[in-house]
Amino acid sequence: MRTKESSIVALAVLSLFWISSCGQMSKPEEVPAPGISSEAIEDLLSSAFVVEGLACQRKAIGSGIAVEAGILTNAHVVAGTDELHVIDRNGDQHLAKIVAFDPQSDLALLHVDGLYAPALPIALPERGAYGVALVGGGGQVKAIPANIDRVVDINIADIYGEGEYRRKGMQLEADISPGDSGGAIIDSSGSVVGLVFSRSNNTDGVSYAVSSEEFSLVTREISPNGVNNGECLRR
């Protein structure tokens, strides 16, 4: 098994940590965001998935979202995983292949043969926008409120804690829990504007997402036969 120690990374003066895939936590009740009806959220959940694999001999759990190119998730969710699956809202498992992997932006793209899921549109995030995060850390996809406090450039290491890269991102007001990495941030129009990747160590309810501006790093670099998904992370 390929392994690599992951390190705690910093965003400006705020301490962050990768959202661990180990264990489960209680989740807040689903609450529709302003401008998004309960009916719309039900439709959106058909495009959201739990992502599961085995990494460093431990179960890795994250979230993913269907877009035109495939299922988007975080690179740190699938790094070094074997037997990767996505689980839909009905609890059905589907074998997934990693067709793009970028540890610098913390993005990965998955392909599932024969899977039909409505592909959500992609839009740019706007400061102050209200929306939801579609997350699956509890083992089942659900929606939680997620408001965009700031749209920021993040100076951050790659998923292995190496180097320093500038990543387009956003600061969120959202109650993110372990396993929610890769959860899509959805705006009031029903578009994907980012993917959750971390939460603050210092401030409750503060989380961070990769902006949709970075998605092209994986949606335009697809290898249909699959790609090397790096070494697994010891969380």
Describe the predicted segments one by one:
Residues 65-67, 97-99, 149, 177:
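Conserved positions in beta-strands of structured domains
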Residues 24-41, 118, 139-141, 193-235:
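C-terminal cap/linker of serine protease catalytic domains
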Residues 65, 175-196:
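Catalytic nucleophile loop of clan PA
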Residues 32-38, 48-74, 92-95, 144-145, ...:
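A conserved glycine-rich beta-strand in the N-terminal activation segment of trypsin-fold
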Residues 18-21:
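C-terminal motif of bacterial Sec signal peptides marking the signal peptidase cleavage site
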Residues 1-10:
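Bacterial N-terminal signal peptides that target proteins for export
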Residues 57-58, 68-143, 226-230:
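Conserved active-site neighborhood of the chymotrypsin/trypsin-like protease fold
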Residues 118-168, 176-180, 196-207:
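Flexible, gly/ser-rich surface segments that form the specificity/activation loops bordering the active-site cleft
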